[in-house]
Amino acid sequence: MGCVASTGNYENEDDPFIQNKRANDLIEQNLQQERNKNKNEVKLLLLGAGESGKSTVLKQMKLLHQGGFTHRERMQYGQVIWADAIESMRTLILQAGKLGIELDSDLKNAHSGQLVNTELHQCKEKIFRANTLDQIDARMAGGSEFLNEYVLKYNGIGSKKKRQTTLGFKESNGADPEEEDETDAFLSEKLAGTSYTGSSETSELKRIDQSTNEEIAYAIKKLWTQDKGIRQCFNRSSEFQLEGSASYYFDNIEKFARVDYVCDDMDILKGRIKTTGITENSFKIGPSTFKVYDAGGQRSERRKWIHCFEGITAVVFVIAISEYDQMLFEDERVNRMHESIVLLDTLLNSRWFANTPFILFLNKVDIFQEKVKRSPIRTWFPNYPGKLGDSETGLKYFESLFLSLNRSNKPIYVHRTCATDTQSMRFVLGAVTDLVIQQNLKKSGIL
């Protein structure tokens, strides 16, 4: 009997109807497995213009849900911050000349013509001569590919060429790159007290300086704490491009000077490595798996992601609310806040995100609250009704402006954030987590 039954089953397997049924059953089984998987999988798209702080939001998620950063990552950030600190001080010295700010390190006695403070002047020269590439220890940084790419911006080419390399296209503001480089060379030599020869190759400043990290750190600290012109220039940093955490670097410069220094959490939150392309990060939060896609915010990066995402649970859009008076790194003719408004308008009303809820982070609120005391919002937004120093009215004004861009019925949730503040971000990210899990359950048909 067993043999007969076996033969019958074998013959049935050749029946096209049975084969089709089994194929359909297998497809349905796979679909059900995918549905079960998707109901616990949350996809977040992290977007925003360049310098908005979205990568800092991602760092907070790593701290809260992934156990933080590896030893290698902490070493890498130490190298990056050290290089940025040197470049930031060099930027302040150069920009002081362009803005007509007199530095204490350049003051001379009216009668003798001698420098009033020789030590300060030597500190300034030391910063100019420091070769940033020489300050990077690839071994201590782990020799990582991302770090090697990062330090390419310190290869000595002009600022215009740096931007062109970053963006992949030339700026069309009428400026001549060679002329701009000549201007920088002139300023460099003038500030250093040497005569301008017209050739940066023979410039005194092009000598490779072999100063130790401790000597360079001392020079930075001396200029930061004792040269009033440097502070005055820093207070006008919205008029040029300066690393957002420069003051933090300067205040802590001695620890970053140590080649074996291991960055703590706050150092990493303050440090910055530009996001290029799209990175995917996974976090296990309760029964759910969060997949967070962090996309580069500079203009040249956006075409890589603006149409690439389907099935996104929610979009987290980060806006640096404090940058209402600053210009883009990649195009110094365009206001950063204006750029964020245009970008948000495009995304909110894009067919790719027609039914996707948005979560807005009004980021860098702490900086905004201080900045509005000295930089009028009305200069850039003439319709702003508030007074100088009224941060609450300013926040409400921008929040209303962003919400008015929504021409659909999609939900928008707004949070005021300081992405470097772990305690406040713990609360905000907790609320966001609960929200997107609820949205995902609705999307899966469970709620």
Swiss-Prot record:
Residues 43-56 are annotated as: G1 motif. Belongs to the G-alpha family. A lipid is attached at residue 2 (N-myristoyl glycine). One of its GO terms (biological process) is G protein-coupled receptor signaling pathway. A lipid is attached at residue 3 (S-palmitoyl cysteine). It holds the Pfam family G-alpha. Residues 359-366 are annotated as: G4 motif. Mg(2+) binds at residues 55, 275. Residues 267-275 are annotated as: G2 motif. GO terms for cellular component: cytoplasm; heterotrimeric G-protein complex. GTP binds at residues 51-56, 269, 275, 297, 363-364, 366, 419. Residues 290-299 are annotated as: G3 motif. Residues 40-447 form the G-alpha domain. Its cofactor is Mg(2+). G proteins are composed of 3 units; alpha, beta and gamma. The alpha chain contains the guanine nucleotide binding site. One of its GO terms (molecular function) is GTPase activity. This is Guanine nucleotide-binding protein alpha-1 subunit. It comes from Kluyveromyces lactis (strain ATCC 8585 / CBS 2359 / DSM 70799 / NBRC 1267 / NRRL Y-1140 / WM37). Keywords: GTP-binding, Hydrolase, Lipoprotein, Magnesium, Metal-binding, Myristate, Nucleotide-binding, Palmitate, Pheromone response, Transducer. Residues 417-422 are annotated as: G5 motif. InterPro entries: Fungi_Gprotein_alpha, Gprotein_alpha_su, GproteinA_insert, P-loop_NTPase. CDD domains: G-alpha. Guanine nucleotide-binding proteins (G proteins) are involved as modulators or transducers in various transmembrane signaling systems. This protein is involved in the mating response pathway.
